[in-house]
Amino acid sequence: MQNEIRQDKIIGSRRFSNYFWAFFLLVGGLGFLLAGISSYFKVNLLPFTNTTELVFIPQGLVMMFYGALSLGISIYTLLTIILDIGSGYNEYNRIENLVKVVRKGFPGKNREILLTYSLSNVRAIGIKITEGLNPTRSIYLCLKDERNIPLTPVQEPTAISNLEEEATDLAKFLDLRLENL
């Protein structure tokens, strides 16, 4: 029975890159905001530089704007980390003949996203590899009605050999063919 159900855990927004950018934007945003406030009140709020000599309009005002924008993006990123947006699992159940895709969303009516598909509606397992400026390497659940449901999380592109191996294992487990999208 254990080999009839497969569950793949999906890491959501709790990745190192999100922690790094949240911290970087928080520190940078605070620095810019304090520099702008220092130029307005002519009081040095930053110990490592003298920002009282900045002219408030336009330098101080622009620094305050960029600082506030950076803090806003940092807070948003921290909230996605705290709420673990995008995490969940993919469950492939050969006993019940179902595929379940479960993800966490933002608070509200759709906090937990549950997509359920019958294995009889699944045509194949697809792999999509795009190179270039924004490379993507993803595994898809290809349905008979021509919809493609992404199964891999948004992350740094994995090695093509690992992606192919993972897709091949899944296709063998579900007894489906593998296709290139």
From Swiss-Prot:
Name this polypeptide is given: Photosystem I assembly protein Ycf4
GO cellular component terms listed in the entry, alphabetical order: chloroplast thylakoid membrane; photosystem I
Organism domain of life: Eukaryota
Keyword flag Thylakoid: yes
Membrane topology, as annotated: Multi-pass membrane protein
Regions that span the bilayer: 19-39, 62-82
Role this protein plays: Seems to be required for the assembly of the photosystem I complex.
One Pfam family matching this protein: Ycf4
Keyword field: Chloroplast, Membrane, Photosynthesis, Plastid, Thylakoid, Transmembrane, Transmembrane helix
Family: Belongs to the Ycf4 family.
Subcellular location per the Swiss-Prot or TrEMBL entry: Plastid, Chloroplast thylakoid membrane
Entries under NCBIfam families matching the protein: PRK02542.1 (NF002712)
Source organism (scientific name): Phaeodactylum tricornutum (strain CCAP 1055/1)
Gene this chain is encoded by: ycf4
GO biological process terms, semicolon-separated: photosynthesis
